[in-house]
């Protein structure tokens, strides 16, 4: 049997502001942005450049209980992990683009890591795993 996770839904306040952040600040690719009239919503998918795996489905909150989770989808823990082939290139570019890092870079046994916030406050790891770490 072969299975894989294709999308992770990320609850957002507004499609366009989320697209702006992920595409213009994090340099993700906009894979799809399709309006679904029957449900009055958009199917918006973004993915890191060069990714061949999981993508983010940007899902606009449509109910009060969904709004409560914007920016806190992991209960204050790191929610998503962005692996890179060049930590310092991406860290420096992200700082120049105004990304807020809440924990500075650290060398760990598994590689180099720093924690940043997305536009809503969800925590992400930017990391470069060392050669001994499987993905």
UniProtKB/Swiss-Prot annotation:
Gene3D superfamilies per the UniProt record, alphabetical: 2,3-Dihydroxybiphenyl 1,2-Dioxygenase, domain 1
Location of the VOC domain: 4-129
InterPro entries: Glyas_Bleomycin-R_OHBP_Dase, Glyas_Fos-R_dOase_dom, VOC
Pfam family, one: Glyoxalase
Disulfide bond positions: none
Family, per entry: To B.subtilis YwkD.
Name recorded for this polypeptide: Uncharacterized protein Sfri_3691
């Amino acid at each position: 049997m072969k299975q894989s996770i294709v999308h992770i839904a990320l609850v957002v306040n507004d499609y366009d502001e989320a697209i702006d952040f992920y595409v213009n600040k994090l340099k993700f690719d906009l894979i799809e942005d399709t309006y679904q009239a029957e449900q009055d919503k958009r199917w918006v998918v973004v993915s890191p450049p060069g990714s061949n795996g999981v993508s983010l489905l940007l899902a606009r909150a449509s109910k009060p209980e969904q709004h409560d989770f914007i920016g806190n989808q992991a209960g204050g823990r790191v929610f998503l992990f962005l692996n890179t082939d060049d930590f310092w290139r991406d860290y420096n570019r992200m700082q120049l683009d105004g990304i807020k890092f809440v924990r500075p870079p650290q060398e760990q046994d598994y590689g180099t890591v720093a924690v940043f916030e997305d536009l809503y406050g969800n925590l992400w790891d930017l990391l470069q795993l060392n050669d001994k770490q499987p993905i």
